[in-house]
Amino acid sequence: MGDIGRREVLGNAGKLAIAAGIGTRLGGKGTRPGQVRTAAARRLQPDWAALASRLNGRLLRPGDRGFVTAGLPYNRRYAAVRPAGVALCADVADVQTALAWARHYGLPFTARSGGHSYGGYSASRGLVISLARMNSVQVDRDSLTITLGPGALNRDIYAGLAGTGVAAPSGRCPTVAISGLLLGGGFGFSSRHLGLTCDQLLETEVVTASGALLRVSPQSHSDLFWACQGGGGGNFGINTRFVLRATPVAGVSVYKLEWDWQHAAAVLGAVLDLMPTAPHSMSCRVGLDVTGGGPVAGGTPRRGVSALGLYFGSAAELTELLQPVLKAARPSDQLIEDRTFVQAAALLAREVPKGSFTSKSRYLDRPLPAAGIDTAIAWVERWPGSSNASGAGATLFAWGGKISERAPTAAAFVHRDAAFLMDNEATWLNRDSARVISANLDWAAGMYTALAQYGNGQAYQNFIDPALRDWEAAYYGQNLHRLMEVKRRYDPDDVFRFAQAIPPAS
C-alpha cells in the first residue's frame, strides 16, 4: 500500500480529514465526482455482478486482490476516500459500460488514468473507471504521429519513442498518464523548444455523458477539440485515445547542477536573469529544496539548490550557455552531457512526491526581484519538517519559447505569456502527527501568500489546488466562458463534475 496500510488509514482518519481540508466534497453530502442522483436511482441498489459480467476487463471490489492498490489515489492526502469498486477497463466498450452503469444507479464515479490529481479528484467513494490498462503506444515515423491509449504513462511514451528518432513533449514524472497531462496543458523539459503536450494534439476520442463515442479533431467537434487542449481533465467526457504530432530529433544534451545552500540567492538570481533571453532550445528548472527535519517535526534540515534542464544542441554549446550560472557560484555537483532524447528524459525524471503533499502554483510575468528571492529563501528555511523524504521547497520553471507562440485563445490553455511557472510544495506522511500536517499546510499557504505580489493571478490547472480561491479565473482566464459553453453542449446535465470542474453555461 505504499507508505500506509489499512490500519493506518483507519487510525489516521482524523488526520486525513485535516490534511484533505475538503469536508464531505469527495463522498459525503455535497458535490461528488460524477454524481447524478435521481429519485429513482437513489432507490436502486447497485448490481455489481451485472457490471462485472459486462466488462471485457475486470471489476475489483473490496477484498479482491489488487483492490487496495487500484483504489488508492497517488496523493495519499486523500487516502481515506476509498471506492466501492474499480472497473479495470480493457477497451472503449468497457468505459461506455461502466459510465452507463454508474449513471443508471446514480453512483458517484470518476475516470482515472494515472491517478495523480493533486487535489484528489481522481478518487471516489463510488466507482473508479480505471483507464490504466488502456496504455498502448504506437509511433508512426512515416506520418510523424504517436497514438496513445489514455492510460499510457510518461515512462511508456518514452519507451515507445526509444530508437525512433522522433519526440513529443511529455512530462517529467514517469507515472503520470497522458490523459491528465495533456488535457491540463502538459509541460516538460522539451516544451520551450517543441511546445506544450496539448499543442501536439491532432485528434482524440471522447466518450460523452450520453455514452456516445466522438472522434474529435479540428475538423470534427472543433469546439470540443479546442477545449481538450488545456481545458482540464474530467470536465467534458472520458478521453479514450490521443493522436499526437511527433517531431524528428537528433541528439540533445542535459545538465544537472547542485549547490550548497549559502549560494541560494546568487544561483537563483543568475538563473532568473539568464532564462528570459536564453535560446528556446534550452529549458530550466531551478529549485530551493529542503528535506529532513524542522522546528515542528524535529531533526536537522538539509537544504540545497538545484538547476537542471535539456538543450537541443551539444554539451559544449550548453556549457557555454550556462556560464553565467556556473560563475555565480561553483556547483558542489555538476553534470553536463550529450544524450539521446530518451536518455535525457530518464536522467531528468522525478516522481511526483510520494506520500501526502500540497502544491500551490502561480505564473510570473517577470523574474523574481531580489526581495522576492530573499522571501522565498526565508520561507524554505522556515519549513516545519516532516517524515517524508521528499521534503519541501520552491521551484521555478522557465516558460516562454514555443509555448508563447500560440495566442492565449488559440487553445483552451491560456497561460502563454508568462516568464516563469512557480510552484511551492510541502510533503508529509500520514503517520506524521496532526500538528506536523497542519504546520505543513500552514507553511505552504503562508509562502504562497508571501509571494503573491509577484504573480500575475494565474495558476497551472495540472497543479490543481483545492484551496485556491477564484480558481476559475486562475486556471482558465479569458477562456472560461467559452469552456462553459462547450460544457453546456457536451455535458449539459453536469455529469462530469467535481469541486473544481468547469460548470455548464446557464
Regions of interest found by a model, annotated:
Residues 2-506:
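Soluble FAD-dependent oxygen oxidases
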